[in-house]
Amino acid sequence: FGPEMICGIAKIDGLLVGIVANKQGLLMNYPEYKENSVGVGGKLYRQGLIKMNEFVTLCARDRIPMIWIQDTTGIDVGDDAEVAELLGLGQSLIYSIQNSDLPMMEITLRKGTAAAHYVLGGPQGNDTNAFSIGTAATEINVMNGETAAAAMYTGKLVREKKAGKDLGPTIDKMNAMINDYNEKSKPAFCAKMGFVDEIVKMPALRNYVLAFTDAAYQNPEKICPIHQMLLPRIIRDEK
């Protein structure tokens, strides 16, 4: 259920932590609301959003701090996605995160795109975020430059081509927009604008995870005794 997302409990320095992470790769015959489809890891679909929502709720019940590890290209879009109510499920996940009152840490390993970045524990949509970490490969944006340029100028290119006009000036504007988007999604810019609190080397990530976990368990207002009283659970498919 929700194969694009990994949700589970881990022990860090002997302490329980909830982990949510994107899973990469092709997902055959998925999502279920599209016939003969092939899902792409890193994108969020209906089941994955439901899965994360329930996992956040369970972590909140047992007062288990959470770490979000994201490499996402966004939430699925299109008519089928609208019918599957992905927007509402994303809103529900944000609501659950906000009301969990759990200390959370977010790591953007590579891509953090659009609303998926927010619902995966991103600081822009999470008041409980203790801090966010980026890497040398981090890119955070609303969409990539090529997509933005195509959305902005495709119609104009079609009209100019029909009119027999020179396409060069419009293509130059598209390239300029792509370059601007690329520059403003680089790690240094993300840190400068506060999208992440710090850019760290990959081997150093564990130290930050340890520091967050140890700090979370020293806060009596966030942790209660039942956090060790876990019961076996499973997130079931609707079928």
Model-derived features with residue positions:
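Ligand-binding clefts of soluble mixed alpha/beta catalytic domains
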Residues: 1-239
